[in-house]
């Protein structure tokens, strides 16, 4: 036995750490290579982990950037949604201002100017899908009409007989219902 050849001092110098080192120490060069390949594998996996963590951080940052840009785009869309419509209405306003600045106009010229301005406004409405609701003679529709009252009429019951104020829709959505009188 090998332990018997050692002096008592050498045997006493054994500590649990040295015993553990001796037990874990590779006995052959193959085991030493395997230990090296394990270290290499650990280093490789740590590198992959760091790479994946960086990719996750990049993806998070990219997601935040997309959310921020989308919020900015929504804010701009809200802010400038009426820009085209507003610019089209400016021509109508200009026509009204021109009519008011005419010095010696006749009633007929005012009427002609108002008719032209109304045509301009109607063209703007058509361009932006604003449709007039003028339901005289139609069945009363509570989704598009607001009944102000009922009147005796020769028309069929529940039929619109008079429009007090026209209504309007925007892309088939009611902006303002028509104010109507309905037959009893």
Swiss-Prot record:
Say what the protein does. Answer: Participates actively in the response to hyperosmotic and heat shock by preventing the aggregation of stress-denatured proteins, in association with DnaK and GrpE. It is the nucleotide exchange factor for DnaK and may function as a thermosensor. Unfolded proteins bind initially to DnaJ; upon interaction with the DnaJ-bound protein, DnaK hydrolyzes its bound ATP, resulting in the formation of a stable complex. GrpE releases ADP from DnaK; ATP binding to DnaK triggers the release of the substrate protein, thus completing the reaction cycle.
Which intervals carry biased composition (Basic and acidic residues)?
Answer: 1-17
Quaternary structure? Homodimer.
Q: Which family does it belong to?
A: Belongs to the GrpE family.
Where does the record place it? Cytoplasm
Name its GO BP terms in alphabetical order. Answer: protein folding
Q: Which InterPro entries match?
A: GrpE, GrpE_coiled_coil, GrpE_head
Q: Name one GO cellular component term.
A: cytosol
Has the keyword Cytoplasm been applied to this entry?
Answer: yes
Show the segment(s) annotated as Disordered.
1-39
One GO MF term attached to the UniProt entry: unfolded protein binding
- Where does this protein chiefly localize? cytoplasm
- Alphabetically list the UniProt keywords: Chaperone, Cytoplasm, Stress response
Protein known as: Protein GrpE
Question: Carries keyword Cytoplasm?
Answer: yes
Which ranges are annotated Polar residues under compositional bias? 18-27
């Amino acid at each position: 036995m090998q332990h018997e050849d050692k002096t008592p001092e050498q045997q006493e110098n054994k500590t649990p750490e040295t015993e553990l080192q001796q037990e874990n120490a590779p006995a052959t060069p193959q085991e030493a290579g395997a230990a090296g390949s394990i270290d290499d594998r650990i280093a490789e996996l740590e590198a992959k982990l760091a790479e994946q963590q960086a990719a996750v951080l990049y993806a998070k940052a990219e997601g935040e950037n997309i959310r921020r840009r989308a919020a900015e785009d929504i804010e701009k869309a809200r802010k400038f949604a009426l820009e085209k419509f507003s610019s089209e209405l400016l021509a109508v306003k200009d026509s009204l201002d021109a009519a008011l600045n005419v010095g010696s106009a006749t009633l007929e010229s005012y009427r002609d100017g108002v008719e032209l301005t109304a045509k301009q406004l109607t063209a703007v409405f058509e361009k932006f899908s604003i449709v007039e609701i003028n339901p005289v003679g139609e069945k009363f529709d509570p989704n598009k009409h607001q009944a102000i009252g009922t009147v005796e009429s020769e028309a069929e019951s529940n039929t619109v007989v008079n429009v007090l104020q026209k209504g309007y829709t925007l892309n088939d959505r009611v902006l303002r219902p028509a104010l109507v009188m309905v037959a009893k």
